[in-house]
Curated annotation (Swiss-Prot):
Free-text function comment from the UniProt entry: Component of the ubiquinol-cytochrome c reductase complex (complex III or cytochrome b-c1 complex) that is part of the mitochondrial respiratory chain. The b-c1 complex mediates electron transfer from ubiquinol to cytochrome c. Contributes to the generation of a proton gradient across the mitochondrial membrane that is then used for ATP synthesis.
Cofactor note: Binds 2 heme b groups non-covalently.
Record-stated family: Belongs to the cytochrome b family.
UniProt source species: Corcorax melanoramphos (White-winged chough)
Name the UniProt record assigns to this protein: Cytochrome b
Coiled-coil segments: none
Superkingdom of source: Eukaryota
Amino acid sequence: TALLLAMHYTADTSLAFTSVAHTCRNVQFGWLIRNLHANGASMFFICIYLHIGRGFYYGSYLNKETWNIGVILLLTLMA
């Protein structure tokens, strides 16, 4: 969905809302693509948080190097 949305992306901040409105109104199934993208991203981060919770449960934070790499990856995902 990100590739389909990127085709209609506008980097100008004054046209950002117009870009979203164009995608939803003028692109065939644009509203569906936008909703799938938003819900898919939310599900992705829920899975990430569950994975972190599993690490807490099994004590993976005791392995400092692995845990620090995981923290760096999480921060990279959020950036």
